């Protein structure tokens, strides 16, 4: 088979199963409204949960820092790219979340890959929730460690897997809030089981940080867990982009030596770090609390109004509200029907989710109003299916 035949066959297979992904060009993609092809839609696909991507204080912080530092960092943090803005943000994050150290990464994907790649060796074992993010599972598959996956949020299955003999070290991997199901992991129980078996715990709290817990400290704080490795990302609740790993002093020093994604990547722009510090200040303030409370009320309003006889609504109380429709083509038709009525929603299909669980992944944000939720419910219930 030639290279071209391999490429063509893969694309043909995706088209045949209604799983071919496509991108949409938008002129505004975050906030209450999405604008595409000159038309305005209510936006139910954004991860900007607290509406901070449009916050004037955060925008101003980035602009001022860009004037001071320029628009790029100029190099890896190990060469010339670790500025006072990066240092200040790392210290603020560590203090806020109660860890000795924080290390910044250019993305959550890079952070997850870096930690697992740097830590795991031959004869080690990774025990990951089967619904863990692609960045975690890919890193686990590529590492020299053995990967075992436990049934989603099933702590008994996790315990059984950890009990089986392992010559090396064991790492338990889970998420705080799951990106496709919107539910949360039983983190306190998972942590207890991990420690009983002398395993470390890595939690990716991309969708919980900033949005849940006291001062927005996230799912671990809310549920009483403190993993050895906490990954937080800044493209959701923070409204910006990037990520950080929270850990001990020694683990931070280790990652600075052996995390190739960190050592060999240009660091985030200092202006971005400054904007993230401004975002953190909003998250921790009374305004941040009010934004979280408004979002929670909108989620409750939506869940109370969904017609459960027509859609499978998962037990999710986060900003992520998936409606399971099962069939790929039906999910695509439903997303298109919503767009025709001015509501932008995304159909999620395999391989992102298991076969037979195609869904509309609806995301609610603080930028929405109650009337937006009511409109979404009206359109959903009127969609001709």
From Swiss-Prot:
Substrate binds at residues 21, 133, 352. Pathway: Cofactor biosynthesis; biotin biosynthesis. Keywords: Biotin biosynthesis, Pyridoxal phosphate, Transferase. Its cofactor is pyridoxal 5'-phosphate. GO terms for molecular function: 8-amino-7-oxononanoate synthase activity; pyridoxal phosphate binding. The keyword Transferase applies. Pyridoxal 5'-phosphate binds at residues 108-109, 179, 207, 233. GO terms for biological process: biotin biosynthetic process. The keyword Transferase applies. Its EC number is 2.3.1.47. It is an enzyme of class 2 (transferase). Catalyzes the decarboxylative condensation of pimeloyl-[acyl-carrier protein] and L-alanine to produce 8-amino-7-oxononanoate (AON), [acyl-carrier protein], and carbon dioxide. Belongs to the class-II pyridoxal-phosphate-dependent aminotransferase family. BioF subfamily. Homodimer. This is 8-amino-7-oxononanoate synthase. It comes from Salmonella dublin (strain CT_02021853). The lineage of its organism: Bacteria, Pseudomonadati, Pseudomonadota, Gammaproteobacteria, Enterobacterales. The gene is bioF.
């Amino acid at each position: 088979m030639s290279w071209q035949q391999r490429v063509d066959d893969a694309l043909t297979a995706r088209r045949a199963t209604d799983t071919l992904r496509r991108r949409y060009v938008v002129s505004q993609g975050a906030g209450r409204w999405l604008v595409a092809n000159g038309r305005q839609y209510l936006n139910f696909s954004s991860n900007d949960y607290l509406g901070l991507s449009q916050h004037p204080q955060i925008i101003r912080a980035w602009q001022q820092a860009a004037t001071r530092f320029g628009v790029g960092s100029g190099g890896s943090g190990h060469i010339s790219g670790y500025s006072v803005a990066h240092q200040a943000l790392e210290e603020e994050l560590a203090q806020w979340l109660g860890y000795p150290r924080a290390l910044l990464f250019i993305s959550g994907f890079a952070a997850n890959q870096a930690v697992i790649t740097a830590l795991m060796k031959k004869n080690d074992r990774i025990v990951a929730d089967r619904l863990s993010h692609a960045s975690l599972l890919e890193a686990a598959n590529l590492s020299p460690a053995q990967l075992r996956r436990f049934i989603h949020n099933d702590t008994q299955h996790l315990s059984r897997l950890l009990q089986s003999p392992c010559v090396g070290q064991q790492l338990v991997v889970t998420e705080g809030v799951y990106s496709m199901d919107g539910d949360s992991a039983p983190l306190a129980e998972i942590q207890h089981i991990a420690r009983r078996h002398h395993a470390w715990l890595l939690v990716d709290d991309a969708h919980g940080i900033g949005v849940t817990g006291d001062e927005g400290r996230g799912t671990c704080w809310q549920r009483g867990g403190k993993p050895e490795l906490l990954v937080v990302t800044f493209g959701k609740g923070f409204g910006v982009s990037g990520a950080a790993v929270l850990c001990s002093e020694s683990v931070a020093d280790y990652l600075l030596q052996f995390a190739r994604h960190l050592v060999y990547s240009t660091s985030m722009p200092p202006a971005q770090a400054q904007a993230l510090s401004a975002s953190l200040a909003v998250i921790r303030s009374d305004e941040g609390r009010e934004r979280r409370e408004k979002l929670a009320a909108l989620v409750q309003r939506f869940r109370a109004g969904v017609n459960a006889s027509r859609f499978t609504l998962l037990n999710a109380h986060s900003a992520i509200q998936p409606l399971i429709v099962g069939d790929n083509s039906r999910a695509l038709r439903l997303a298109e029907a919503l767009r025709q009525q001015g509501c932008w929603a995304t159909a999620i299909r395999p391989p992102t989710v298991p076969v037979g669980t195609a869904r509309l992944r609806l995301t609610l944000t603080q930028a929405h109003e109650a009337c937006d939720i009511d409109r979404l419910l009206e359109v959903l219930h009127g969609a001709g299916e």
